[in-house]
Amino acid sequence: MAHPHLLAERISRLSSSLEKGLYERSHAIRLCLLAALSGESVFLLGPPGIAKSLIARRLKFAFQNARAFEYLMTRFSTPEEVFGPLSIQALKDEGRYERLTSGYLPEAEIVFLDEIWKAGPAILNTLLTAINERQFRNGALVEKIPMRLLVAASNELPEADSSLEALYDRMLIRLWLDKVQDKANFRSMLTSQQDENDNPVPASLQITDEEYERWQKEIGEITLPDHVFELIFMLRQQLDKLPDAPYVSDRRWKKAIRLLQASAFFSGRSAVAPVDLILLKDCLWYDAQSLNLIQQQIDVLMTGHAWQQQGMLTRLGAIVQRHLQLQQQQSDKTALTVIRLGGIFSRRQQYQLPVNVTASTLTLLLQKPLKLHDMEVVHISFERSALEQWLSKGGEIRGKLNGIGFAQKLNLEVDSAQHLVVRDVSLQGSTLALPGSSAEGLPGEIKQQLEELESDWRKQHALFSEQQKCLFIPGDWLGRIEASLQDVGAQIRQAQQC
Protein backbone atom coordinates (compact mmCIF):
# COMPACT_ATOMS: atom_id res chain seq x y z
CA MET A 1 0.00 0.00 0.00
CA ALA A 2 1.01 3.65 -0.34
CA HIS A 3 2.72 5.33 2.59
CA PRO A 4 -0.05 6.23 5.08
CA HIS A 5 0.79 9.94 5.10
CA LEU A 6 0.88 10.04 1.29
CA LEU A 7 -2.54 8.41 1.18
CA ALA A 8 -3.90 10.93 3.70
CA GLU A 9 -2.50 13.79 1.61
CA ARG A 10 -4.03 12.35 -1.55
CA ILE A 11 -7.48 11.99 0.01
CA SER A 12 -7.23 15.56 1.33
CA ARG A 13 -6.41 16.88 -2.15
CA LEU A 14 -9.18 14.76 -3.65
CA SER A 15 -11.69 16.22 -1.21
CA SER A 16 -10.50 19.77 -1.95
CA SER A 17 -11.11 19.16 -5.65
CA LEU A 18 -14.60 17.83 -4.99
CA GLU A 19 -15.42 20.86 -2.82
CA LYS A 20 -14.61 23.44 -5.54
CA GLY A 21 -17.57 25.66 -6.29
CA LEU A 22 -19.65 24.27 -3.43
CA TYR A 23 -20.01 26.77 -0.62
CA GLU A 24 -20.39 25.72 3.03
CA ARG A 25 -20.56 22.10 1.95
CA SER A 26 -17.02 20.99 2.83
CA HIS A 27 -18.10 18.86 5.79
CA ALA A 28 -20.88 17.21 3.78
CA ILE A 29 -18.52 16.44 0.88
CA ARG A 30 -15.88 15.01 3.21
CA LEU A 31 -18.30 12.74 5.05
CA CYS A 32 -19.91 11.59 1.80
CA LEU A 33 -16.42 10.84 0.49
CA LEU A 34 -15.63 8.89 3.67
CA ALA A 35 -18.91 7.00 3.28
CA ALA A 36 -18.07 6.17 -0.35
CA LEU A 37 -14.58 5.01 0.61
CA SER A 38 -16.02 2.68 3.25
CA GLY A 39 -19.15 1.56 1.39
CA GLU A 40 -21.71 3.26 3.63
CA SER A 41 -24.93 5.22 3.10
CA VAL A 42 -25.72 8.88 3.78
CA PHE A 43 -28.97 10.72 4.48
CA LEU A 44 -29.10 14.44 3.66
CA LEU A 45 -31.85 16.41 5.40
CA GLY A 46 -32.65 19.92 4.23
CA PRO A 47 -34.89 22.17 2.15
CA PRO A 48 -34.93 22.03 -1.66
CA GLY A 49 -32.27 23.81 -3.68
CA ILE A 50 -29.26 23.51 -1.37
CA ALA A 51 -27.05 21.31 -3.60
CA LYS A 52 -27.98 17.91 -2.16
CA SER A 53 -28.06 16.30 -5.60
CA LEU A 54 -24.90 18.13 -6.68
CA ILE A 55 -23.01 16.65 -3.73
CA ALA A 56 -23.92 13.16 -4.89
CA ARG A 57 -22.99 13.92 -8.50
CA ARG A 58 -19.61 15.25 -7.42
CA LEU A 59 -18.78 12.02 -5.61
CA LYS A 60 -18.87 10.14 -8.91
CA PHE A 61 -15.74 12.03 -9.97
CA ALA A 62 -13.79 10.62 -7.01
CA PHE A 63 -13.55 7.34 -8.93
CA GLN A 64 -12.07 6.64 -12.35
CA ASN A 65 -14.81 4.40 -13.69
CA ALA A 66 -17.82 5.12 -11.49
CA ARG A 67 -21.33 5.07 -12.90
CA ALA A 68 -24.01 7.20 -11.28
CA PHE A 69 -27.76 6.83 -10.94
CA GLU A 70 -30.12 9.43 -9.53
CA TYR A 71 -33.86 9.49 -9.23
CA LEU A 72 -36.55 11.72 -7.71
CA MET A 73 -39.06 9.58 -5.85
CA THR A 74 -42.80 10.22 -5.97
CA ARG A 75 -45.75 8.31 -4.60
CA PHE A 76 -46.21 6.89 -8.09
CA SER A 77 -42.62 5.69 -8.63
CA THR A 78 -42.35 2.08 -9.77
CA PRO A 79 -39.54 -0.47 -9.34
CA GLU A 80 -38.99 -0.32 -13.11
CA GLU A 81 -37.89 3.32 -12.84
CA VAL A 82 -35.26 2.48 -10.22
CA PHE A 83 -34.14 -1.07 -10.92
CA GLY A 84 -34.77 -1.24 -14.67
CA PRO A 85 -37.65 -2.34 -16.93
CA LEU A 86 -38.62 -5.94 -17.51
CA SER A 87 -37.06 -7.64 -20.53
CA ILE A 88 -40.03 -8.32 -22.79
CA GLN A 89 -37.88 -10.53 -25.01
CA ALA A 90 -36.71 -12.73 -22.13
CA LEU A 91 -40.26 -13.03 -20.86
CA LYS A 92 -41.65 -13.79 -24.32
CA ASP A 93 -38.94 -16.13 -25.63
CA GLU A 94 -37.82 -17.91 -22.47
CA GLY A 95 -40.50 -17.14 -19.91
CA ARG A 96 -37.87 -15.51 -17.67
CA TYR A 97 -38.68 -12.63 -15.32
CA GLU A 98 -35.61 -10.46 -15.83
CA ARG A 99 -34.89 -6.74 -15.62
CA LEU A 100 -32.67 -4.74 -17.96
CA THR A 101 -30.47 -3.09 -15.35
CA SER A 102 -28.02 -1.18 -17.53
CA GLY A 103 -28.16 2.50 -16.57
CA TYR A 104 -30.17 1.82 -13.41
CA LEU A 105 -29.40 1.39 -9.70
CA PRO A 106 -28.20 -2.26 -9.84
CA GLU A 107 -25.23 -1.27 -12.04
CA ALA A 108 -24.30 2.07 -10.45
CA GLU A 109 -21.46 2.77 -8.02
CA ILE A 110 -22.91 6.11 -6.87
CA VAL A 111 -26.66 6.30 -6.20
CA PHE A 112 -28.71 9.39 -5.30
CA LEU A 113 -32.38 9.01 -4.37
CA ASP A 114 -34.21 12.26 -3.68
CA GLU A 115 -37.43 12.47 -1.62
CA ILE A 116 -36.62 8.96 -0.42
CA TRP A 117 -39.58 8.66 2.00
CA LYS A 118 -42.06 8.84 -0.88
CA ALA A 119 -40.90 5.48 -2.22
CA GLY A 120 -43.42 2.65 -2.13
CA PRO A 121 -42.99 -0.71 -0.34
CA ALA A 122 -41.88 -2.55 -3.49
CA ILE A 123 -38.95 -0.16 -3.96
CA LEU A 124 -38.09 0.00 -0.26
CA ASN A 125 -37.90 -3.77 0.20
CA THR A 126 -35.57 -4.21 -2.77
CA LEU A 127 -33.51 -1.23 -1.64
CA LEU A 128 -33.04 -2.72 1.83
CA THR A 129 -31.54 -5.87 0.33
CA ALA A 130 -29.30 -3.78 -1.90
CA ILE A 131 -27.96 -1.79 1.06
CA ASN A 132 -27.59 -4.72 3.45
CA GLU A 133 -26.19 -7.39 1.18
CA ARG A 134 -25.06 -5.46 -1.90
CA GLN A 135 -27.17 -7.91 -3.91
CA PHE A 136 -30.07 -7.60 -6.35
CA ARG A 137 -32.46 -10.45 -7.15
CA ASN A 138 -33.04 -10.33 -10.88
CA GLY A 139 -35.52 -13.07 -11.65
CA ALA A 140 -33.91 -16.39 -10.72
CA LEU A 141 -30.46 -14.81 -10.42
CA VAL A 142 -28.93 -13.04 -7.45
CA GLU A 143 -26.55 -10.45 -8.83
CA LYS A 144 -23.86 -8.60 -6.91
CA ILE A 145 -24.25 -4.84 -7.21
CA PRO A 146 -21.26 -2.45 -7.26
CA MET A 147 -22.85 0.32 -5.17
CA ARG A 148 -20.21 2.15 -3.13
CA LEU A 149 -22.30 5.06 -1.94
CA LEU A 150 -26.02 5.60 -1.51
CA VAL A 151 -27.04 9.20 -0.84
CA ALA A 152 -30.69 9.57 0.10
CA ALA A 153 -32.24 12.99 0.60
CA SER A 154 -35.43 14.57 1.85
CA ASN A 155 -36.72 17.78 3.38
CA GLU A 156 -38.36 15.81 6.19
CA LEU A 157 -37.66 12.95 8.55
CA PRO A 158 -39.53 9.64 8.32
CA GLU A 159 -42.57 9.30 10.50
CA ALA A 160 -41.96 7.48 13.75
CA ASP A 161 -43.13 3.86 13.91
CA SER A 162 -43.53 3.71 10.14
CA SER A 163 -42.36 1.16 7.60
CA LEU A 164 -39.54 3.56 6.76
CA GLU A 165 -37.71 2.99 10.06
CA ALA A 166 -35.76 0.00 8.74
CA LEU A 167 -34.40 1.94 5.77
CA TYR A 168 -33.59 5.00 7.92
CA ASP A 169 -31.57 2.82 10.29
CA ARG A 170 -29.41 1.63 7.37
CA MET A 171 -28.30 5.20 6.62
CA LEU A 172 -25.26 5.46 8.82
CA ILE A 173 -24.32 9.10 8.27
CA ARG A 174 -27.04 11.70 8.73
CA LEU A 175 -26.36 15.33 7.83
CA TRP A 176 -28.62 18.31 8.41
CA LEU A 177 -27.96 20.93 5.71
CA ASP A 178 -29.18 24.50 5.37
CA LYS A 179 -28.91 27.44 2.99
CA VAL A 180 -25.59 29.25 2.48
CA GLN A 181 -25.24 31.56 5.50
CA ASP A 182 -22.04 33.58 5.09
CA LYS A 183 -22.41 36.79 3.07
CA ALA A 184 -19.16 36.36 1.11
CA ASN A 185 -20.00 32.74 0.29
CA PHE A 186 -23.47 33.75 -0.82
CA ARG A 187 -22.03 36.38 -3.17
CA SER A 188 -19.48 33.92 -4.57
CA MET A 189 -22.22 31.38 -5.20
CA LEU A 190 -24.34 33.95 -7.05
CA THR A 191 -21.50 35.12 -9.29
CA SER A 192 -19.81 31.77 -9.92
CA GLN A 193 -19.57 30.80 -13.59
CA GLN A 194 -18.37 27.26 -12.93
CA ASP A 195 -20.26 24.49 -14.71
CA GLU A 196 -21.51 22.31 -11.87
CA ASN A 197 -21.38 19.21 -14.05
CA ASP A 198 -17.70 19.56 -15.01
CA ASN A 199 -15.25 17.08 -13.51
CA PRO A 200 -13.13 19.05 -10.99
CA VAL A 201 -10.84 16.13 -10.06
CA PRO A 202 -7.46 15.54 -11.78
CA ALA A 203 -7.08 12.01 -13.12
CA SER A 204 -4.06 11.46 -10.88
CA LEU A 205 -6.27 11.79 -7.79
CA GLN A 206 -9.13 9.59 -8.93
CA ILE A 207 -9.48 6.19 -7.28
CA THR A 208 -9.14 3.02 -9.34
CA ASP A 209 -11.26 -0.08 -8.82
CA GLU A 210 -8.18 -2.01 -7.65
CA GLU A 211 -7.35 0.64 -5.03
CA TYR A 212 -10.91 0.69 -3.76
CA GLU A 213 -11.07 -3.08 -3.32
CA ARG A 214 -7.69 -3.19 -1.61
CA TRP A 215 -8.61 -0.39 0.77
CA GLN A 216 -11.77 -2.22 1.89
CA LYS A 217 -9.59 -5.03 3.25
CA GLU A 218 -7.06 -2.68 4.81
CA ILE A 219 -9.76 -0.65 6.58
CA GLY A 220 -10.77 -3.80 8.44
CA GLU A 221 -7.21 -4.17 9.74
CA ILE A 222 -7.33 -0.86 11.62
CA THR A 223 -7.34 -1.65 15.36
CA LEU A 224 -9.66 -0.37 18.07
CA PRO A 225 -7.48 0.33 21.16
CA ASP A 226 -8.85 -0.49 24.59
CA HIS A 227 -8.94 3.12 25.76
CA VAL A 228 -10.96 4.15 22.69
CA PHE A 229 -13.41 1.28 23.22
CA GLU A 230 -13.83 2.44 26.84
CA LEU A 231 -14.78 5.91 25.58
CA ILE A 232 -17.33 4.41 23.18
CA PHE A 233 -18.79 2.25 25.94
CA MET A 234 -18.92 5.27 28.26
CA LEU A 235 -20.90 7.17 25.63
CA ARG A 236 -23.26 4.22 25.12
CA GLN A 237 -23.85 3.86 28.86
CA GLN A 238 -24.50 7.58 29.23
CA LEU A 239 -27.01 7.56 26.38
CA ASP A 240 -28.80 4.58 27.91
CA LYS A 241 -29.31 6.60 31.11
CA LEU A 242 -30.88 9.60 29.37
CA PRO A 243 -34.67 9.36 28.95
CA ASP A 244 -34.71 11.42 25.73
CA ALA A 245 -31.73 9.73 24.06
CA PRO A 246 -32.38 8.05 20.70
CA TYR A 247 -32.36 4.28 20.39
CA VAL A 248 -29.10 3.16 18.75
CA SER A 249 -29.16 -0.39 17.45
CA ASP A 250 -26.22 -2.77 17.79
CA ARG A 251 -26.08 -2.82 13.99
CA ARG A 252 -25.59 0.96 13.90
CA TRP A 253 -22.80 0.79 16.51
CA LYS A 254 -21.12 -1.96 14.47
CA LYS A 255 -21.30 0.01 11.23
CA ALA A 256 -20.14 3.16 13.01
CA ILE A 257 -16.96 1.41 14.15
CA ARG A 258 -16.08 0.62 10.54
CA LEU A 259 -16.56 4.29 9.70
CA LEU A 260 -14.15 5.20 12.51
CA GLN A 261 -11.66 2.68 11.14
CA ALA A 262 -11.96 4.29 7.70
CA SER A 263 -11.41 7.73 9.22
CA ALA A 264 -8.23 6.50 10.89
CA PHE A 265 -7.04 4.70 7.74
CA PHE A 266 -7.47 7.70 5.45
CA SER A 267 -5.84 9.93 8.08
CA GLY A 268 -2.68 7.82 7.94
CA ARG A 269 -3.15 6.02 11.26
CA SER A 270 -3.10 2.31 12.08
CA ALA A 271 -5.58 2.57 14.96
CA VAL A 272 -8.78 4.42 15.78
CA ALA A 273 -8.07 7.51 17.90
CA PRO A 274 -10.37 9.42 20.27
CA VAL A 275 -10.65 12.23 17.71
CA ASP A 276 -12.39 9.85 15.29
CA LEU A 277 -15.25 9.46 17.78
CA ILE A 278 -16.44 12.96 16.89
CA LEU A 279 -17.86 11.35 13.73
CA LEU A 280 -20.46 9.66 15.92
CA LYS A 281 -22.26 13.00 16.19
CA ASP A 282 -23.37 12.45 12.58
CA CYS A 283 -24.26 8.77 13.09
CA LEU A 284 -26.30 8.43 16.28
CA TRP A 285 -29.01 11.11 16.09
CA TYR A 286 -32.56 10.52 14.95
CA ASP A 287 -34.31 13.90 14.98
CA ALA A 288 -33.63 17.55 15.87
CA GLN A 289 -33.88 16.94 19.62
CA SER A 290 -31.55 13.97 19.61
CA LEU A 291 -29.12 15.78 17.29
CA ASN A 292 -28.48 18.40 19.98
CA LEU A 293 -28.35 15.81 22.74
CA ILE A 294 -25.82 13.63 20.91
CA GLN A 295 -23.60 16.61 20.19
CA GLN A 296 -23.69 17.66 23.85
CA GLN A 297 -22.74 14.19 25.07
CA ILE A 298 -19.89 13.83 22.57
CA ASP A 299 -18.66 17.31 23.49
CA VAL A 300 -18.51 16.23 27.15
CA LEU A 301 -16.67 13.07 26.12
CA MET A 302 -14.13 14.94 23.99
CA THR A 303 -13.44 17.86 26.32
CA GLY A 304 -13.66 15.92 29.57
CA HIS A 305 -12.50 12.34 29.09
CA ALA A 306 -10.95 11.55 25.70
CA TRP A 307 -7.53 12.87 26.70
CA GLN A 308 -7.99 12.35 30.44
CA GLN A 309 -8.86 16.00 31.09
CA GLN A 310 -11.25 15.26 33.94
CA GLY A 311 -8.97 12.60 35.38
CA MET A 312 -6.06 15.02 35.47
CA LEU A 313 -8.21 17.70 37.12
CA THR A 314 -9.31 15.17 39.74
CA ARG A 315 -5.69 14.30 40.44
CA LEU A 316 -4.84 18.00 40.61
CA GLY A 317 -7.64 18.56 43.10
CA ALA A 318 -6.29 15.79 45.33
CA ILE A 319 -2.78 17.26 45.15
CA VAL A 320 -4.07 20.73 46.04
CA GLN A 321 -6.04 19.30 48.96
CA ARG A 322 -2.93 17.51 50.20
CA HIS A 323 -0.94 20.72 49.87
CA LEU A 324 -3.55 22.55 51.92
CA GLN A 325 -3.40 19.84 54.59
CA LEU A 326 0.34 20.31 54.82
CA GLN A 327 -0.15 24.05 55.04
CA GLN A 328 -2.75 23.61 57.76
CA GLN A 329 -0.16 21.86 59.86
CA GLN A 330 1.74 25.14 59.82
CA SER A 331 -1.33 27.33 60.20
CA ASP A 332 -0.84 28.06 63.92
CA LYS A 333 2.23 30.03 62.92
CA THR A 334 0.39 31.87 60.19
CA ALA A 335 -3.01 32.64 61.75
CA LEU A 336 -4.24 35.90 60.27
CA THR A 337 -4.13 38.64 62.90
CA VAL A 338 -6.05 41.80 62.02
CA ILE A 339 -5.18 45.25 63.37
CA ARG A 340 -7.54 46.90 65.85
CA LEU A 341 -8.31 50.56 65.18
CA GLY A 342 -9.10 53.21 67.76
CA GLY A 343 -12.85 53.36 67.34
CA ILE A 344 -13.39 55.60 70.43
CA PHE A 345 -16.54 57.21 69.06
CA SER A 346 -17.71 54.15 67.13
CA ARG A 347 -20.39 51.81 68.43
CA ARG A 348 -18.57 48.91 66.75
CA GLN A 349 -14.92 47.94 67.00
CA GLN A 350 -13.14 48.47 63.67
CA TYR A 351 -10.25 46.49 62.21
CA GLN A 352 -8.03 46.46 59.16
CA LEU A 353 -5.85 43.91 57.38
CA PRO A 354 -2.11 43.85 58.02
CA VAL A 355 -0.16 45.99 55.54
CA ASN A 356 1.71 42.94 54.21
CA VAL A 357 -1.54 41.33 53.04
CA THR A 358 -1.90 42.83 49.57
CA ALA A 359 -3.45 40.19 47.27
CA SER A 360 -6.77 41.12 45.64
CA THR A 361 -8.13 37.66 46.47
CA LEU A 362 -7.24 36.09 49.82
CA THR A 363 -7.25 32.33 50.35
CA LEU A 364 -7.47 31.61 54.09
CA LEU A 365 -7.07 28.14 55.56
CA LEU A 366 -9.28 26.70 58.28
CA GLN A 367 -7.19 25.34 61.14
CA LYS A 368 -9.72 22.53 61.32
CA PRO A 369 -12.24 21.64 58.59
CA LEU A 370 -15.87 22.64 59.10
CA LYS A 371 -19.06 21.65 57.33
CA LEU A 372 -20.46 24.84 55.82
CA HIS A 373 -23.44 24.91 53.45
CA ASP A 374 -23.36 21.07 53.27
CA MET A 375 -19.72 21.06 52.19
CA GLU A 376 -16.56 19.95 53.97
CA VAL A 377 -14.52 23.16 53.86
CA VAL A 378 -10.75 23.44 54.28
CA HIS A 379 -10.19 26.91 52.86
CA ILE A 380 -12.18 30.00 51.92
CA SER A 381 -11.45 32.60 49.26
CA PHE A 382 -12.37 36.23 49.99
CA GLU A 383 -12.29 39.30 47.82
CA ARG A 384 -9.91 41.65 49.65
CA SER A 385 -12.19 44.65 49.16
CA ALA A 386 -15.19 42.79 50.63
CA LEU A 387 -13.17 41.62 53.65
CA GLU A 388 -11.80 45.13 54.28
CA GLN A 389 -15.31 46.59 54.19
CA TRP A 390 -16.57 43.96 56.64
CA LEU A 391 -13.66 44.65 59.04
CA SER A 392 -14.37 48.35 58.87
CA LYS A 393 -18.17 48.50 58.76
CA GLY A 394 -19.46 45.05 59.61
CA GLY A 395 -22.54 43.63 57.90
CA GLU A 396 -22.66 40.58 55.64
CA ILE A 397 -19.52 38.79 54.46
CA ARG A 398 -19.32 36.16 51.73
CA GLY A 399 -16.57 33.85 50.55
CA LYS A 400 -16.06 30.97 48.13
CA LEU A 401 -15.92 27.65 49.94
CA ASN A 402 -12.83 25.69 48.89
CA GLY A 403 -12.40 28.42 46.28
CA ILE A 404 -15.20 27.12 44.04
CA GLY A 405 -18.73 28.10 43.06
CA PHE A 406 -20.52 31.25 44.13
CA ALA A 407 -19.55 33.19 47.24
CA GLN A 408 -21.60 31.99 50.24
CA LYS A 409 -22.76 33.92 53.29
CA LEU A 410 -20.53 33.20 56.31
CA ASN A 411 -20.70 33.53 60.09
CA LEU A 412 -17.37 35.31 60.63
CA GLU A 413 -16.07 37.12 63.72
CA VAL A 414 -12.89 38.53 65.24
CA ASP A 415 -11.89 36.84 68.53
CA SER A 416 -10.07 38.34 71.51
CA ALA A 417 -6.70 37.47 69.96
CA GLN A 418 -7.70 39.50 66.88
CA HIS A 419 -7.89 36.34 64.75
CA LEU A 420 -10.63 35.71 62.19
CA VAL A 421 -12.89 32.82 63.23
CA VAL A 422 -15.54 31.20 61.01
CA ARG A 423 -18.37 29.23 62.64
CA ASP A 424 -20.74 26.53 61.39
CA VAL A 425 -24.45 26.20 62.22
CA SER A 426 -23.60 24.59 65.57
CA LEU A 427 -21.30 27.55 66.32
CA GLN A 428 -18.16 25.43 66.24
CA GLY A 429 -15.33 27.71 65.20
CA SER A 430 -12.16 27.42 63.16
CA THR A 431 -9.44 30.06 63.02
CA LEU A 432 -8.49 31.32 59.57
CA ALA A 433 -4.82 31.35 58.64
CA LEU A 434 -2.71 32.59 55.79
CA PRO A 435 -1.11 29.94 53.57
CA GLY A 436 2.53 29.17 54.24
CA SER A 437 5.10 31.63 52.96
CA SER A 438 5.80 31.28 49.26
CA ALA A 439 9.46 31.66 50.02
CA GLU A 440 9.36 28.20 51.54
CA GLY A 441 8.43 26.77 48.14
CA LEU A 442 6.32 23.71 47.49
CA PRO A 443 6.91 20.68 49.70
CA GLY A 444 8.94 18.01 47.90
CA GLU A 445 6.02 15.59 47.93
CA ILE A 446 3.72 18.10 46.25
CA LYS A 447 6.34 19.27 43.78
CA GLN A 448 6.99 15.70 42.60
CA GLN A 449 3.29 14.93 42.19
CA LEU A 450 2.75 18.11 40.17
CA GLU A 451 5.74 17.34 37.96
CA GLU A 452 4.36 13.85 37.27
CA LEU A 453 0.95 15.31 36.49
CA GLU A 454 2.46 17.89 34.14
CA SER A 455 4.40 15.12 32.38
CA ASP A 456 1.16 13.17 31.86
CA TRP A 457 -0.52 16.32 30.56
CA ARG A 458 2.27 16.84 28.03
CA LYS A 459 1.86 13.26 26.81
CA GLN A 460 -1.89 13.70 26.35
CA HIS A 461 -1.43 17.01 24.55
CA ALA A 462 1.19 15.46 22.27
CA LEU A 463 -1.20 12.60 21.47
CA PHE A 464 -3.94 15.04 20.56
CA SER A 465 -1.56 17.06 18.40
CA GLU A 466 -0.62 13.91 16.48
CA GLN A 467 -4.21 12.73 16.08
CA GLN A 468 -5.94 15.99 15.19
CA LYS A 469 -4.77 15.89 11.55
CA CYS A 470 -8.09 14.37 10.49
CA LEU A 471 -9.79 15.60 7.32
CA PHE A 472 -13.23 14.48 8.43
CA ILE A 473 -13.42 16.38 11.75
CA PRO A 474 -14.59 20.04 11.78
CA GLY A 475 -12.04 22.55 13.05
CA ASP A 476 -14.32 24.01 15.73
CA TRP A 477 -14.39 20.65 17.52
CA LEU A 478 -10.60 20.46 17.47
CA GLY A 479 -10.48 24.01 18.85
CA ARG A 480 -12.68 23.11 21.82
CA ILE A 481 -10.56 20.08 22.63
CA GLU A 482 -7.38 22.15 22.46
CA ALA A 483 -8.96 24.74 24.76
CA SER A 484 -9.93 22.06 27.29
CA LEU A 485 -6.38 20.70 27.36
CA GLN A 486 -4.89 24.18 27.67
CA ASP A 487 -7.21 24.90 30.60
CA VAL A 488 -5.96 21.78 32.40
CA GLY A 489 -2.35 22.76 31.67
CA ALA A 490 -2.92 26.28 32.98
CA GLN A 491 -4.39 24.97 36.24
CA ILE A 492 -1.42 22.63 36.72
CA ARG A 493 1.06 25.47 36.12
CA GLN A 494 -0.86 27.72 38.50
CA ALA A 495 -0.63 25.07 41.21
CA GLN A 496 3.12 24.78 40.63
CA GLN A 497 3.52 28.49 41.29
CA CYS A 498 1.71 28.43 44.64
Swiss-Prot record:
InterPro entries: AAA+_ATPase, ATPase_RavA, ATPase_RavA_C, MoxR, P-loop_NTPase, RavA-like_AAA_lid, RavA_ATPases, RavA_LARA_dom. Keywords: ATP-binding, Chaperone, Cytoplasm, Hydrolase, Nucleotide-binding. It is found in: Cytoplasm. Gene3D superfamilies: 1.20.58.1510, 2.40.128.430, P-loop containing nucleotide triphosphate hydrolases. ATPase activity is stimulated by ViaA. One of its GO terms (cellular component) is cytoplasm. HAMAP family: ATPase_RavA (MF_01625). Component of the RavA-ViaA chaperone complex, which may act on the membrane to optimize the function of some of the respiratory chains. RavA functions as an ATPase. This is Regulatory ATPase RavA. The lineage of its organism: Bacteria, Pseudomonadati, Pseudomonadota, Gammaproteobacteria, Enterobacterales.
